[in-house]
Amino acid sequence: MFAIMTVTGQDHTGIIAAVSTALAELDVNIHNVSQTIMDQWFTMILHVGFDESVLDIATVQERMKPVEKEQGLVIRIQSEALFNAVNEI
């Protein structure tokens, strides 16, 4: 399954490391990533892939909650199909 993950919050050291480590522990592969900082506000969008017979989106979201709390972030994930449908012009 492919999904889109968004990460936002106050910029500080270690955000990318914390998010990528948590995803690696879940065996979630990062296919593409775009990251920027706007006025001390960190934003990152990741295109990720994982085996949906082993893991589902709800589990990924739940397992990212400790990273959200520890890093002071908002992390959201949705299926690539849903993301594309919502953002289609």
Swiss-Prot record:
Q: Which domain of life is it from?
A: Bacteria
Q: Which residues form the ACT domain?
A: 4-82
Q: Which Pfam families match?
A: ACT_6
Classification via InterPro entries: ACT-like_dom_sf (IPR045865), ACT_dom (IPR002912), UPF0237/GcvR_regulator (IPR050990), UPF0237_ACT (IPR022986)
Q: Which family does it belong to?
A: Belongs to the UPF0237 family.
Q: What is this protein called?
A: UPF0237 protein Cgl1544/cg1742
